[in-house]
A protein has these predicted regions:
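Conserved ABC transporter NBD signature motif
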Residues: 60-68, 75-76
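Catalytic Walker B motif of ABC-type/P-loop ATPase nucleotide-binding domains
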Residues: 158-161
C-alpha cells in the first residue's frame, strides 16, 4: 500500500488572470490528521476542491488515494468523504432522509442501508431528532449530520473544509475528539481551517497565504524554528511573523 494518501506537485489554479493557488507541493501520509491553515481567501477551499475532483487544476500534478486528480476525478469522489464549509445538507429533508440521500450518492448497496443509517445516527447522536427537518436543528447538530453523511460509505480518506466555522467552542472540542477517534481507526483526515489553535490537533500542517505555502511541518517544529528563544510563542505568532516576512 502506498504510504501517501495525497501527493501534489506544483499544483496551480487560475481564474482568468487571478492565481488562487500558486504551485503548491505537499503530501499527506495515511492515517494522519493533516491541517491546511490560512486566513480566509488564502486558497484553502480551492485546493481542497481540486483534490476532491470538484474543480480541475490549471497545471501541476497530483494523486488522491492513488487516483490522478486530472483524469480520475470520478473515482476520487467515490472513495473519499467530503464535508464542505456550507455542510451540503438538504434543509427541507430530515436527518434520516439526508443520510439515505448520501447512501445513494455513494452507491452503497441497498442491503447495507439500514445498518449504515443506524451507524450514522449512533456516531452523530442524532437518533432523537432523525425525523425533524434539518433546517430546524442547531448549527452544531447540522455539523454532526454533515460529518455523518460524509462518512456514510465509510471512506478511509476524509476531507473537511472549515468544518468548525460558525459553531461554539464546546462543539469544536467534541468535533475534534471524534476526528481523533476516526484516525485511530485508520482514517486519514485533511482539514482546512483559519483557526490557528486547531493546529494542535494535527500531526502536520501546511500554512498558506495568497495561494502560496509559507511553511509546512509539525506545528511545534514551525514555532521552534521561528522562535527558538520564545517558548511561549504559538502558531498565531508564527503566522504573523511569516506574513511580515512576505511584506
Amino acid at each position: 500500500m502506498h504510504p501517501e494518501a495525497v501527493s501534489v506537485m506544483d499544483l496551480e489554479k487560475k481564474f482568468g488572470h487571478f492565481t488562487a493557488v500558486d504551485r503548491v507541493s505537499f503530501s499527506v501520509k495515511r492515517g494522519e490528521i493533516f491541517g491546511f491553515l490560512g486566513p480566509n481567501g488564502a486558497g484553502k477551499s480551492t485546493t481542497i476542491r481540486m483534490l476532491c475532483g470538484i474543480i480541475v487544476p490549471s497545471s501541476g500534478s497530483g494523486h488522491v488515494a492513488q487516483f490522478d486528480i486530472f483524469t480520475e476525478a470520478e473515482q476520487i469522489r467515490q472513495v473519499i468523504g467530503y464535508m464542505s464549509q456550507k455542510f451540503s445538507l438538504y434543509q427541507d429533508l430530515t436527518p434520516f432522509e439526508n443520510i439515505r440521500f448520501y447512501l445513494g450518492i455513494y452507491n452503497v448497496p441497498s442491503e447495507q442501508w439500514q445498518d449504515r443509517i443506524e451507524w450514522v445516527l449512533n456516531i452523530t447522536r442524532l437518533h432523537g431528532v432523525k425525523d425533524r427537518l434539518t433546517r430546524d436543528l442547531p448549527p452544531g447538530w447540522r455539523q454532526r449530520l454533515a460529518l455523518g453523511c460524509a462518512l456514510v460509505h465509510q471512506p478511509k480518506l476524509l476531507f473537511l473544509d472549515e468544518p468548525t466555522s460558525g459553531v461554539d467552542p464546546i462543539t469544536r472540542r467534541h468535533f475534534w475528539d471524534f476526528i481523533k477517534q476516526l484516525t485511530a481507526q485508520g482514517v486519514t483526515v485533511f482539514v482546512t481551517t483559519h483557526y490557528m489553535d486547531e493546529a494542535q490537533h494535527c500531526n502536520r500542517v501546511v500554512m498558506i497565504n495568497e495561494g502560496q505555502i509559507v511553511a509546512q511541518g509539525h506545528p511545534t517544529e514551525i514555532i521552534r524554528n521561528l522562535f527558538p528563544d520564545r517558548p511561549e510563542a504559538d502558531l498565531n505568532d508564527a503566522f504573523i511573523k511569516l506574513m511580515s516576512r512576505r511584506g
